[in-house]
Amino acid sequence: MSLDFYIYPGVHESGSESISFNITHNLVPMAKKAGLYEPLWRPEENYDEPVLASDVYPAIVAGFNNLVIDPENYKDLNPENGWGDYNSLVDFTADVLAALRQYPLAVVEACR
């Protein structure tokens, strides 16, 4: 099971197709601890729809900063089964943030 996080730049900005990112649900405990779960896994429950990149961006930046400031606080939550780890959540979040910065008016959606 995994999360698919979609960014639809073409809804409010022209010239682009959807961008998608995927990550395992095994990292939910780590994402919750960092403050990333609500904006990435459940944006539609926490923001007015349509949810825009600019809506979730501040919370994802804060969660990302939590991850990188204190890695040891999160590495203990690496899944025992080996599916996903701290580094994959950092990379996933960095990639999502780059796309959100590029398309601040894009609609975002999470499929769980």
Listing of model-derived features with the role each one plays in the protein:
Residues 1-112:
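Acidic (Asp/Glu-rich) sequence patches and key acidic residues
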